[in-house]
């Protein structure tokens, strides 16, 4: 039977039932290195900030840790921002540390075989095989989400799960400055700017997203955007920098990623840009610019 659930509201209603404890989690699939994903948490997916990790290959799906089965769903569409697309056959598990984990785009028959009559799961216990039941119609890819009930936010699985041995190489290319009127300037070709508020963009990687981006002026941090959690306010998802950045701010089109905002004042300044991945590896660039 098909039903529609506002999963985030359901999750929030369970907050009082669980206490906060230390936790350790395991990956829901065996392969979690750099080629194991189609899309990172925080990426631009159909004009939204993704709250999921999307895996690239079919595989067995396992429970990330001990928990109680909250919902088993078949071809369910949810209209909340945290779950904006068809989840397909999905299993949602509630854990004793104010987290819920969501395993979506599963094979319906294997869901029935593995969890239909169960009330709880042990860490590493098989939930199902991946399927083609969700929005990813062409591949059997797991869509995996973690929601923190205390923070009312989606948590990047990469900051909770065991660290991978390698990550997709994240490069800094195509640096652009955008003024308040929306005009873009290629920083390689423009070294002189009128004073004012500017956004700094780079060319977007279509799969990977950084862990953190930092913008400095003369060595002073003026903005820093973290890709560790996605919050929700007034029906809109956002990442936190010096302010709350929505999808339209972070990804104004399919090709750009926001690194941060800055106020340029008259004089000669050094603009510093840093991106950091989940292994702590950083890429840095600096530019000397003149402002009038």
Model regions and ranges:
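Bacterial N-terminal signal peptides that target proteins for export
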Residues: 1-9
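Bacterial N-terminal signal peptides
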Residues: 9-19
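Surface-exposed, glycine-biased beta-strand/turn segments
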Residues: 20-89, 94, 122-123, 132, ...
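Short histidine-centered loop motifs in beta-beta connectors
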Residues: 56-58, 62-63, 95-124
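Exoplasmic/lumenal beta-rich domain surfaces
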Residues: 84, 100, 108, 216-263
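A structural signal for beta-strand boundary/capping segments at domain termini and interdomain linkers
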Residues: 100, 280-284
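A glycine-anchored, Pro-Gly-centered beta-turn/N-cap motif
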Residues: 196, 260, 265-269
């Amino acid at each position: 039977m098909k039903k529609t659930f506002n999963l985030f509201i359901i999750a929030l209603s369970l907050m009082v039932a669980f206490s906060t404890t230390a936790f350790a989690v395991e990956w829901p699939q065996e392969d979690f290195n750099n080629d194991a994903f189609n899309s990172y948490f925080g990426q631009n997916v159909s004009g939204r900030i993704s709250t999921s990790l999307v895996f690239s290959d079919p595989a067995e799906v396992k429970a990330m840790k001990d928990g109680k089965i909250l919902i088993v769903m078949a071809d369910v569409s949810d209209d909340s921002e945290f779950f904006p697309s068809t989840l397909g056959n999905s299993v949602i598990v509630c854990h004793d540390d104010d987290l819920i984990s969501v395993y979506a785009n599963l094979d319906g028959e294997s869901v029935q075989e593995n969890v239909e009559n169960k009330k709880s799961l042990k860490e590493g216990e098989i939930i199902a095989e991946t399927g083609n039941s969700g929005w990813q119609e062409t591949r059997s890819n797991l869509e995996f989400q973690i929601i923190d009930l205390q923070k009312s936010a989606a948590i990047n699985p990469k900051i909770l799960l065991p660290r991978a041995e390698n990550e997709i190489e994240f490069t800094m290319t195509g640096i652009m400055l955008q003024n308040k009127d929306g005009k873009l300037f290629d920083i390689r070709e423009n070294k002189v700017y009128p004073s004012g508020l500017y956004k700094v963009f780079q060319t977007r990687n279509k799969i990977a997203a950084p862990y953190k981006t930092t913008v400095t002026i003369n060595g002073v941090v003026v903005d820093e955007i973290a890709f560790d959690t996605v919050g929700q306010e007034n029906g809109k998802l956002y990442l936190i920098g010096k302010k709350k950045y929505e999808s339209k701010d972070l990804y104004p089109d399919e090709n750009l990623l926001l690194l941060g905002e800055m106020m340029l004042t008259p004089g000669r300044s050094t603009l510093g840009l840093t991106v950091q991945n989940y292994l702590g590896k950083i890429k840095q660039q600096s530019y000397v610019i003149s402002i009038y």
